[in-house]
Amino acid sequence: MDDTTDAFLRELASREGRTLRAQGDGDLGARMWRAVDAALAEYRAVIVVGSDCLGYDAAYLGDAAAALERGFDAVLGPALDGGYVLAGFTRLAPAVFAGMSWGADTVLACQRERFAALGLRWHELPERADIDRAQDLWRLGDAAQALAIGRTSP
């Protein structure tokens, strides 16, 4: 999907001094590879977040950035379902995302194995919930209700 022609996003990018880039073709891994590779050409570190997680805030993102500043090559924000909601990098090894079964409950385990095989040092943040299936929406509703009455939920 190419949202670089969306008027709202173009205005926001212009106002913030940012550049919109098309994701291009391929699976999630190929698209993340291009995004991270391009960002690392300009910046010391990059953090990629999923749009299907409502459970991170400025502190969570700050913890991810702090891990990268402490010298880790990567940081992961695990999802409750076996995937991850956040990935950050200070360096990118070839094939870090290649051949992953995106959407499977083994993505996080596979990513850990890949990091280890590539010699990357990584830090993991606390788990967060994301929204992949209909039942995840029910959990989100339960969490909102719990917050409204003063309890906590993942």
Task: Walk through the language-model features, giving the residues of each.
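Short, glycine-/small-residue-rich phosphate/pyrophosphate-handling segment
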Residues: A93-R114
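Conserved alpha/beta core of the MobA/IspD/sugar-nucleotide pyrophosphorylase nucleotidyltransferase superfamily
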Residues: A109-P154
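Conserved donor-nucleotide/metal-binding helix-loop-beta segment in metal-dependent transferases, i.e.
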Residues: Y56-D81
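Short aromatic-hydrophobic micro-motifs that form the base-stacking/packing surface
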Residues: I47-V49
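Short acidic donor-binding/metal-coordinating loop in glycosyltransferase active sites
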Residues: S51-C53
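Short phosphate-binding loop-to-helix
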Residues: E11-A45, A104
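Conserved catalytic core of nucleotide-sugar-dependent glycosyltransferases
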Residues: A74-A95, W102
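Glycine/proline-rich, flexible active-site/cofactor-binding loop segments
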Residues: M1-G24, V85, R91-P94
